[in-house]
Amino acid sequence: MVLILGRRLNREDLGVRDSPATKRKVFEMDPKSLTGHEYFDFSSGSSHAENILQIFNEFRDSRLFTDVIICVEGKEFPCHRAVLSACSSYFRAMFCNDHRESREMLVEINGILAEAMECFLQYVYTGKVKITTENVQYLFETSSLFQISVLRDACAKFLEEQLDPCNCLGIQRFADTHSLKTLFTKCKTFALQTFEDVSQHEEFLELDKDELIDYICSDELVIGKEEMVFEAVMRWVYRAVDLRRPLLHELLTHVRLPLLHPNYFVQTVEVDQLIQNSPECYQLLHEARRYHILGNEMMSPRTRPRRSTGYSEVIVVVGGCERVGGFNLPYTECYDPVTGEWKSLAKLPEFTKSEYAVCALRNDILVSGGRINSRDVWIYNSQLNIWIRVASLNKGRWRHKMAVLLGKVYVVGGYDGQNRLSSVECYDSFSNRWTEVAPLKEAVSSPAVTSCIGKLFVIGGGPDDNTCSDKVQSYDPETNSWLLRAAIPIAKRCITAVSLNNLIYVAGGLTKAVYCYDPVEDYWMHVQNTFSRQENCGMSVCNGKIYILGGRRENGEATDTILCYDPATSIITGVAAMPRPVSYHGCVTIHRYNEKCFKL
């Protein structure tokens, strides 16, 4: 091994000879005699690069070794092509290819500010730059132009830290323009969570229509009450009333007018001159009035509460049993499909009964009848979380169904232990009375019953022990009469129906099929299949989707599955499991206040 030394030795020293190549003195050494490493990796660290950059920056200030002048807005910046090219792929492409700029001493760049170029060069030559609220926008745009991603990201991060109700909408628009998805999302989330404050600032009034709708239609909008949304929309419209008046109806379709307090609705909304002079808004006002009278019977996207108000739509499962001949369950439990949480409510009274009927009236729940020949009717007060006995049925029954139509409860058909019943009773909650109305054309038990387009529909059922019906019987409360409509494609009993968006959906009956009926056009269609056959399942509409809960399988055992069908996509998915298998239970949707409501 040869070890090169950096000093001269006396020729007389033992073992020294002249190097023929360099005339320097070297030692002849045996590698075996070395006890340490054969080499030493030395690094001065990042300070070396910093020192070089510092010197280059001094060269730039002194115009020493500069080989290009960048001209921006008439101001000249002497620079080094090598430094610019090393830092920016934009300049590397400009100077390293056969472009005209690679040969010219003076290169003019348009579209940026001279001040921005000064900040940019400060970063290029020092690795440091001061980002402020005054320069962040043009510094971001300059770093984007010159493809300096590190500086660009630093500017975006700085903007995130500056979010405030007075500027978040402007920053969001900036992020959208420059495809900054992370910053855009954070701005939108911030604006949703501080909407009450955001809507008071000038930026809010300068939103375009689509941007405004994007906020007011969101379920994630954080507000104390829906009145805040209405007032924000009206402020926006009145800001440029002549231009924005034609947009009022479209905007109000995204305000949940039915959820406004009735007093506020009457004293503020209905008397607003702009609304009064907009006939196209009358239908929205009518919908709100109907909801104030009918409650949850009247469902639309505008009747779904925003979660930030503390209220949410929940599915309430009432009673049921685990298997045929099994123990009747006393439980009343609510399920929130958004959070997946189950909560216990007051237990069902006199739970020894089975095969009763359940429906929701406004925001309360009714349970009627039950095996054997019970006339009892109970109502669950959702505000007090208690069950209250109300007026009894005129005729005891079980295997019947209930539905609400125009604010009144209808008990339909059923079985009295000997015969299928055609009798129909109507309950007025204000007078607490049951009255007989026109009977069914065909007596059935275990049909599917729901209301839609102002009429009551009784679908299928069992006219006797051995047969199933495919008839669809429609009741008109104005004429107190029944008509037969288009038959369901398959005759079934123990089926369940719900209505959504003026369509009726039917499932159960030990079939996988989910059918949809259009009562206006009077025709049926098969829309989807469930994953297994079941009957006597629960079915309810919640958050604009249809949920199928539990039911009894072909072997007689109950199931704990929950399926969710989305009519918008026609996709059915398995969601979760119920606390226990159950069938012959009631399922309804109500609004419930959450103890753990959303807070910032």
From Swiss-Prot:
Gene3D superfamilies: 1.25.40.420, Kelch-type beta propeller, Potassium Channel Kv1.1, Chain A
GO biological process: intermediate filament organization; proteasome-mediated ubiquitin-dependent protein catabolic process; protein autoubiquitination; protein ubiquitination
Compartments, as annotated in UniProt: Perikaryon; Cell projection, Axon; Cytoplasm; Cell junction, Desmosome
Pfam families tied to this protein: BACK, BTB, Kelch_1, Kelch_KLHDC2_KLHL20_DRC7
Residue ranges occupied by any BTB domain in the UniProt entry: 66-133
Entries under InterPro entries matching the protein: BACK, BTB-kelch_protein, BTB/POZ_dom, BTB_POZ_KLHL24, Kelch-typ_b-propeller, Kelch_1, KLHL24_BACK, SKP1/BTB/POZ_sf
Domain of life: Eukaryota
Tissues expressed in: Expressed in the brain.
Example of a GO MF term: ubiquitin-like ligase-substrate adaptor activity
Keywords: Cell junction, Cell projection, Cytoplasm, Kelch repeat, Repeat, Ubl conjugation, Ubl conjugation pathway
Main location: other
Gene Ontology CC terms, in alphabetical order: adherens junction; axon; Cul3-RING ubiquitin ligase complex; cytoplasm; desmosome; perikaryon
Repeat region (Kelch), residues: 314-363, 365-407, 408-454, 456-502, 504-544, 546-592
UniProt PTM comment: Autoubiquitinated. Autoubiquitination leads to proteasomal degradation and is necessary to control KLHL24 levels.
PANTHER family in UniProt: KELCH PROTEIN, KELCH-LIKE PROTEIN 24
Oligomer status and interactors: Forms homodimers. Interacts with GRIK2. Component of the BCR(KLHL24) E3 ubiquitin ligase complex, composed of CUL3, RBX1 and KLHL24. Interacts with CUL3. Interacts with KRT14.
Its biological purpose: Necessary to maintain the balance between intermediate filament stability and degradation, a process that is essential for skin integrity. As part of the BCR(KLHL24) E3 ubiquitin ligase complex, mediates ubiquitination of KRT14 and controls its levels during keratinocytes differentiation. Specifically reduces kainate receptor-mediated currents in hippocampal neurons, most probably by modulating channel properties. Has a crucial role in cardiac development and function.
Descriptive protein name: Kelch-like protein 24
